[in-house]
Amino acid sequence: MSPQTETKASVGFKAGVKDYKLTYYTPDYETKDTDILAAFRVTPQPGVPPEEAGAAV
């Protein structure tokens, strides 16, 4: 019989939505020759910040 392991809920990621501009937005990013530019037109639903709607693309 294999030993039991315990998983703690506080380890790793917590469930929930994180603010996009606080976790993924990198304003000082410098483009590279291998980057691909893609443009999307996004209209957020009422009450949704534009950067959050853009993050969903």
Curated annotation (Swiss-Prot):
Gene Ontology biological process terms in this record: photorespiration; reductive pentose-phosphate cycle
Catalysis performed (reactions): 2 (2R)-3-phosphoglycerate + 2 H(+) = D-ribulose 1,5-bisphosphate + CO2 + H2O; D-ribulose 1,5-bisphosphate + O2 = 2-phosphoglycolate + (2R)-3-phosphoglycerate + 2 H(+)
One of the record's GO molecular function terms: monooxygenase activity
Chain positions with N6,N6,N6-trimethyllysine modification: 14
Keywords assigned: Acetylation, Calvin cycle, Carbon dioxide fixation, Chloroplast, Lyase, Methylation, Monooxygenase, Oxidoreductase, Photorespiration, Photosynthesis, Plastid
Positions of modified residues (N-acetylproline): 3
Additional comment: The basic functional RuBisCO is composed of a large chain homodimer in a 'head-to-tail' conformation. In form I RuBisCO this homodimer is arranged in a barrel-like tetramer with the small subunits forming a tetrameric 'cap' on each end of the 'barrel'.
Name used for this protein in its record: Ribulose bisphosphate carboxylase large chain
